[in-house]
């Protein structure tokens, strides 16, 4: 146990778990707020606490299963691809916020149920990321979750504001997911033998390339989305303008 805590790699992995948890739990915090917004004031705190407790329980179970599955051949390769996709998706602005369709309940247990179900569905990306950062170490997984969960509950709104103010945080977060994806790829049982025969720098280069790929691809797709939106707006303006001219001519 003492050796584990004195290992620098342990603390690097803990920081990765905390960062991934905080990064991918911003929407979950909004869901909690939306689900409890119609509760009586005196029940809101209970709704948040009970909902978060249930969501945490489900998330821990999901993560344990994910860590167990990651010991099987090809699973880490699939997980790495999923993490790359999650990281890229994180950098692309969404049309609507995930939480806008969350139904607010006026009853305590209805709100709790909404929080648990929504968190379960929205935490799949979180689970894959945390399981990858834990590298099959259950002790590390528990330690990381115990630290990050209270931080999520109390500081996720603050982090959301920071992300709005400093978008570079989102890019760094996406790159982190790409880095973890690269690490997962290098430790899959199928490529482990090949990876161990490579120079030490390769073990850092592959994760670094994963992070770089996510950052570049995500920003490129986001830029394309902005250009496409501007083009659609211009077309709409031209169509509406020509319609107005036709209406005026017919009126004359």
Each PLM stretch: what is its role?
Residues 1-252:
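Multi-pass alpha-helical transmembrane bundle typical of ion/small-solute transporters
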């Amino acid at each position: 146990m003492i050796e584990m805590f004195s290992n620098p790699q342990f603390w690097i992995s803990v920081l990765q778990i905390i960062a991934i948890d905080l990064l991918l739990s911003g929407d979950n915090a909004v869901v909690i707020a939306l689900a409890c917004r119609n509760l009586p004031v005196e029940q809101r705190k209970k709704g948040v606490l009970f909902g978060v407790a249930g969501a945490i329980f489900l998330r821990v179970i999901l993560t344990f299963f994910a860590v167990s599955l990651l010991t099987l051949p090809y699973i880490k390769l699939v997980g790495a691809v999923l993490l790359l996709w999650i990281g890229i998706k994180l950098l692309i602005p969404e049309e609507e916020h995930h939480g806008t369709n969350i139904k607010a309940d006026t009853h305590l247990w209805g709100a709790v149920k909404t929080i648990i179900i929504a968190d379960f569905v929205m935490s799949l990306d979180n689970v894959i990321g945390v399981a990858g950062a834990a590298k099959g170490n259950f002790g590390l997984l528990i330690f990381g979750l115990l630290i990050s969960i209270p931080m999520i509950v109390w500081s996720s709104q603050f982090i959301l504001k920071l992300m709005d103010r400093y978008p570079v945080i989102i890019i760094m977060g996406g790159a982190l997911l790409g880095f973890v994806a690269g690490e997962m790829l290098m430790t899959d049982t199928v490529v482990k033998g090949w990876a161990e025969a490579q120079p030490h720098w390769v073990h850092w280069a592959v994760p670094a390339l994963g992070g770089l790929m996510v950052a570049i691809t995500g920003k490129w797709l986001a830029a394309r989305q902005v250009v496409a939106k501007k083009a659609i707006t211009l077309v709409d303006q031209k169509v509406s303008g020509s319609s107005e001219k036709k209406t005026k001519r017919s009126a004359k």
